[in-house]
Curated annotation (Swiss-Prot):
Annotated GO biological process: translation
Alphabetically ordered keywords of this record: Methylation, Ribonucleoprotein, Ribosomal protein, RNA-binding, rRNA-binding, tRNA-binding
Function according to Swiss-Prot or TrEMBL: With S4 and S5 plays an important role in translational accuracy.
Entry protein name: Small ribosomal subunit protein uS12
Homology family: Belongs to the universal ribosomal protein uS12 family.
PANTHER family associated with the record: 30S RIBOSOMAL PROTEIN S12 FAMILY MEMBER
A single Gene Ontology CC term: small ribosomal subunit
């Protein structure tokens, strides 16, 4: 425990919270251009081909972003919107592409949880 005199001489330091999504620079989303679209495999014990893309953001950052949902239309030079949110079994993937905005299409034939995948309400 510090004495009053010690605290007068040198006050307590505030802890600085480190951002989980530094490339967004305190913005909710960022726009970017796909530089590479590919699949990668997750860490043990999971097994799959996860769809990801490398994105050059408008602020100059280059990040890896996960493409959620079944099927996508992204290719090189597609303009995408990026939000925060990591993928636990893919090391280095700390961002998600927003489905249904800019060049990213929504997921086809999706009935539940549509808002998360940019899918319009189906006709009766």
């Amino acid at each position: 425990m510090a004495t009053v005199n010690q605290l007068v001489r040198k006050p307590r330091k505030r802890k600085v919270a480190k951002s989980d999504v530094p490339a967004l620079q305190a913005c909710p989303q960022r726009r970017g251009v796909c530089t590479r679209v590919y699949t990668t495999t997750p860490k043990k014990p999971n097994s799959a081909l996860r769809k990801v893309c490398r994105v050059r953001l408008t602020n100059g950052f280059e990040v890896t972003s996960y493409i959620g949902g079944e099927g996508h239309n992204l290719q090189e030079h597609s303009v995408v919107l990026i939000r925060g949110g990591r993928v636990k079994d893919l090391p280095g993937v700390r961002y998600h592409t927003v489905r249904g905005s800019l060049d990213t299409s929504g997921v086809q034939n999706r009935k539940q949880g549509r808002s998360k995948y940019g899918t319009k309400r189906p006709k009766k």
